[in-house]
Design a protein with these regions (language model features):
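A preference for well-ordered globular domain cores
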Residues: 2-4, 10-198
Length: 198
């Protein structure tokens, strides 16, 4: 004997549940008979909705990964100080941190070099200025990326996700959060400088 299809219609008039029973006598409370077409359409719609969400999430993750890579590349390009470029690869950052720690320990100068330049002794004041510039740069782009990632997670249209690019202007709460974080970081950096200069 063929099973009987049933459906449950919600307050909005949309089918919220479907199923099968052996006979009309076993229809669940609040349900009514449904056609085979209604039964199949319900599951097709659920499958389609799931597929769309899965695709959107995959596109978001891919875009976020791209933005992460762009963030790293942008940081590693470095900063300009006194007309010279200082790269900020992970090793470069470690080197600048080491110079800064040497200054904290009392060093008045420390050997280092700009991109394409020969090594020379940098004075403590220049090391401090380079360190501050480097930290501000890393903090800015890292915070910007984080806010951009949060913005991407709010997008519900695949085309909007695909349009996102690193360096685009943030808006609303995302820009406000970026500004707040940078203002806080600047205060902390100024406190460090003030203590070093006595």
């Amino acid at each position: 004997m063929n099973n009987i299809y049933f459906k449950r219609i919600g307050s909005s008039g949309i089918i919220e549940q479907v199923g099968q029973v052996e006979s009309v006598e076993y229809l669940p409370e609040g349900c009514e008979q449904a056609t085979e077409e209604e039964y199949n359409d319900f599951f097709n719609n659920v499958k389609s909705s799931f597929s769309d969400e899965y695709i959107l999430q995959s596109i978001r993750q891919e875009k976020i990964q791209q933005m992460s890579e762009e963030c790293s590349k942008t940081i590693q390009k470095g900063v300009q100080y006194n007309g010279k470029v200082y790269s900020l690869t992970p090793n470069d950052q470690i080197n600048i941190d080491s110079m800064f720690n040497a200054v904290l320990a009392g060093a008045e100068e420390y050997p280092y070099h700009a991109d394409g330049e020969s090594c020379c002794n940098m004075k403590a004041e220049d090391i401090l200025n380079l360190y501050v510039l480097y930290k501000k740069t890393v903090t800015y782009y890292t915070t910007y990326y984080n806010q951009l990632k949060m913005y991407i997670d709010t997008l519900t249209d695949k085309k909007d996700v695909e349009k996102v690019f690193f360096g685009q202007e943030l808006t609303g709460v995302f820009q406000e959060q970026l500004e707040d974080m940078m203002a806080s970081a600047d205060v902390q950096m100024q406190n460090i400088i003030a203590k070093l200069k006595g």
